[in-house]
Design a protein with these regions (language model features):
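Nudix hydrolase/Nudix homology domain
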Residues: 2-6, 81-84, 95, 128-131, ...
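Short amphipathic beta-strand and strand-loop transition segments with alternating hydrophobic
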Residues: 6-18
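Conserved Nudix-box catalytic region and its N-terminal flanking loop in Nudix hydrolases
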Residues: 10-13, 52-59, 66-105, 122, ...
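Short, solvent-exposed loop/turn elements at beta->coil junctions and helix N-caps
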Residues: 13-16, 45-46, 122-127
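Acidic, metal-coordinating catalytic segment for phosphate/diphosphate chemistry
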Residues: 17-59
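Short, well-ordered beta-strand micro-motif
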Residues: 27-29, 60, 139-141, 165
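Active-site-adjacent beta-strand/loop module that shapes the phosphate/pyrophosphate-binding cleft
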Residues: 31-34, 128-149
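A short coil-to-beta-strand element that immediately follows conserved catalytic motifs
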Residues: 114-121
Length: 216
């Protein structure tokens, strides 16, 4: 059963970029398509490494010999939204890491599972109207053996992360339920689950149609 963290925000205060460790606030001057000079405010990470990508999220499929395919989601308190969130495991990419290396490391740390990266997305924008932060989505597979115990997490100091294994066929419904209970669902996880659910509900929209003359 999912339970909300007892953590809570005690105050918000303004923070100059010069005093911030992880994020900076900048003003952008630019010229729009009509030649008009404009400005924009942007929040940027200070930690981007050589790969040019800030973070990685680990979409994961868990295969078990006698159970349906599932995925592991993590619940943790996120101060910016003042709530417990439901997310796929994710983390920042270290300075000299590749996204795939970070994905394997972070999945192991947050869930205890050893996974294999199957595919990696291009660097995609996290919230392009507010920040230049970007990320890669690494889809991963974890293959379990019958009777294999749940592994121990390897969390960093200060991390309080609850992992939950959810059957893929139930993911969208479970996310909807958690949202009604007051959990905040991470957009990337919700979008993936909603897309999968849409395909399940409307398979006729995704049937390939042979084009006239194809293969001729």
């Amino acid at each position: 059963m999912a339970t909300k963290s007892k953590a809570r925000v005690t105050s918000f205060t303004d923070l100059p970029s010069s005093e911030a460790k992880w994020v900076k606030l900048q003003k952008i001057d630019y010229i729009d398509a009509k030649g008009v000079s404009r400005t924009w405010e942007v929040a940027s990470r200070k930690t981007r490494g050589k790969a040019g990508v800030d973070a990685v999220a680990m979409g994961n499929i868990i295969y078990h010999p006698s159970k349906p395919p599932s995925t592991i989601v993590v619940l943790q308190f996120r101060p910016p939204v003042e709530a417990t969130t439901v997310e796929w495991p994710a983390g920042l990419i270290d300075a000299n890491e590749k996204p795939e290396e970070a994905a394997v490391r972070e999945l192991y740390e947050e869930t205890g599972y050893q996974g294999k990266v199957i595919s990696t997305s291009p660097a995609v924008a996290a919230d392009p109207g507010m920040t230049n932060a970007n990320m890669c989505l690494c889809m991963m597979e974890v293959h379990l053996k019958e009777g294999e115990p749940e592994p121990e997490q390897h969390l960093d100091e200060g991390e309080d992360i609850l992992r939950i294994n959810v059957p893929l066929a139930e993911l969208y419904e479970r996310l909807e339920g958690w949202a009604k209970e007051g959990f905040v669902i991470a957009a990337k996880l919700y979008h993936w689950a909603a897309g999968v659910q849409y395909v399940m509900d409307h398979p006729e929209l995704f049937t390939k149609i042979d084009q006239p003359g194809a293969g001729a």
